[in-house]
């Protein structure tokens, strides 16, 4: 029996998301893309992509995003985040990056057909080390030292990363990647 897999992709209209869409389509995969309502970048998504409009800050939208045909399985790639170079605190930043990730994790846990959860974090979430010291894998992101995780974007990604690692330790098949720009 061949089980159909749907790739659930958040942040699909962003730079990384569109590139992931392109790669998956070239492999013949089915993609369900989570995009913000009215996002003008949606027009760049390949026509083969199934578009789901919603808000990561809505637990109901995240739950609905995971609803796929019975007998199918899914893989969630959570790329969406609010990005800023402003180092200051922002409630919206925390709501989207941390709260949105919590909503996605809750939905994934509620849907056993979700076989894998991949969270796209940031190298900014990794505590900075003195110059010349090699970066090593980190398995604890919270609590963080404010002088080593600089700016609230990086801190929000560190907090969300910890949520994913905690979910993985609790049994969710989840992993984290830390791309750099």
Model-identified regions with their sequence ranges:
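Rossmann-fold NAD(P)-dependent oxidoreductase module
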Residues: 19, 23, 107, 163
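Conserved glycine-rich Rossmann-like NAD(P)H-binding loop of the short-chain dehydrogenase/reductase
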Residues: 29-38
């Amino acid at each position: 029996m061949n089980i159909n897999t749907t790739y659930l992709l958040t942040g699909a209209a962003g730079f990384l998301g569109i590139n992931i869409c392109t790669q998956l389509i070239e492999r013949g995969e089915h993609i369900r893309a989570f995009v913000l309502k009215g996002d003008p970048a949606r027009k760049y998504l390949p026509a083969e992509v199934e578009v789901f409009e919603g808000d990561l800050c809505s637990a109901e939208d995240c739950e609905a995003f995971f609803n796929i045909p019975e007998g199918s399985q899914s893989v969630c790639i959570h790329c969406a985040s609010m990005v800023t170079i402003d180092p200051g605190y922002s409630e919206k930043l925390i709501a989207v990056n941390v709260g949105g990730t919590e909503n996605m994790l809750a939905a994934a846990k509620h849907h056993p057909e979700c076989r894998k959860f991949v969270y796209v974090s940031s190298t900014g979430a990794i505590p900075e080390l003195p110059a010349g010291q090699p970066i090593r894998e980190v398995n604890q992101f919270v609590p963080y030292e404010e002088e080593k995780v600089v700016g609230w974007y990086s801190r929000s990604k560190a907090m969300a990363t910890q949520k994913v690692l905690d979910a993985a330790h609790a049994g969710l098949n989840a992993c984290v990647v830390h791309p750099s720009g």
